[in-house]
Design a protein with these regions (language model features):
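Nucleic-acid enzyme cleavage-core boundary/entry regions
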Residues: 1-240
């Protein structure tokens, strides 16, 4: 918004203040709030443009102006939280309460799929952040691919190579390694009950059966390998 001459400067400022509050962003919020007008606001919006916008908003019944010098200088404007939806409509934006409700619904969908305590706890913390009006960084930075990854990880029952997992679940051999690996390790370190501070990244991922090619895989049950036309049964150590 800096250095722009915008006819909707005041609306942006009002919504920034509303969304920056811990309570005013909620749909049921009510009461009057005020916004002091500084010289910086005139510099950014342009004095003529800001005064004109203020007059139009007052004519619509959306704000009240307290003048320092009538028609030339504004001390502050006052608005009602009950009318926040109208400010969003003027800009064609979705209200914060609707955006967060939509995000919460997505998280709840993934949470219902979760089978393990650690993953449920992770989703629960995301929900709590949204309820407080905070946008979790994981939603902005990683989004659905992270949740798809976590959902598949918690359901692994046997060891699998990271790149095999990545192509099967995320559609590319290096997506997990390049995009999600570091964050997944952090989540497991915080929430998984079998992970401790002494573990390195490889050991952490092993707790959910995700292995690197350099590591040895432990396989449950009988294993039969086809090699040059022969089948090798490792449980009996014989060629069949």
């Amino acid at each position: 918004m800096k250095n722009k001459r915008e006819n909707d400067y005041l609306i942006h400022r009002i919504l920034e203040k509303i969304e920056g509050s811990s309570v005013d962003w909620r749909k049921e919020a009510s009461g009057n709030r005020s916004l002091k007008i500084q010289q910086e606001d005139f510099n950014r919006a342009g004095k003529t443009e800001l005064l004109e916008e203020a007059r139009k908003l007052e004519q619509r019944g959306l704000i009240q102006i307290k003048w320092l010098e009538y028609g030339n200088d504004i001390e502050k404007i006052t608005y009602r939280l009950e009318q926040a939806g109208q400010f969003y409509e003027l800009l064609g934006l979705i209200p914060k309460w609707e955006r967060l409700a939509s995000e919460k619904e997505k998280i709840q969908t993934w949470s219902r799929k979760a089978q393990t305590g650690w993953l449920k706890a992770y989703y629960r913390n995301l929900e709590e952040a949204l309820e407080k009006g905070k946008q979790p960084a994981d939603l902005e930075k990683y989004g659905e691919p992270l949740f798809i990854c976590l959902d598949a990880l918690e359901k692994l029952k046997e060891p699998v190579y990271q790149r095999v997992f990545s192509v099967a679940v995320l559609g590319g051999t290096k997506v997990f390694e390049n995009v999600l690996r570091t964050r997944v390790v952090s989540i497991l370190s915080e929430y998984h009950p079998d992970v401790d501070e002494a573990m390195n990244d490889k050991e952490v991922l092993s707790q959910v059966y995700l292995e690197e090619y350099a590591q040895e895989l432990a396989v449950k049950g009988n294993l039969r390998i086809s090699l040059k036309g022969n089948e090798i049964s490792l449980d009996r150590k014989s060629v069949v």
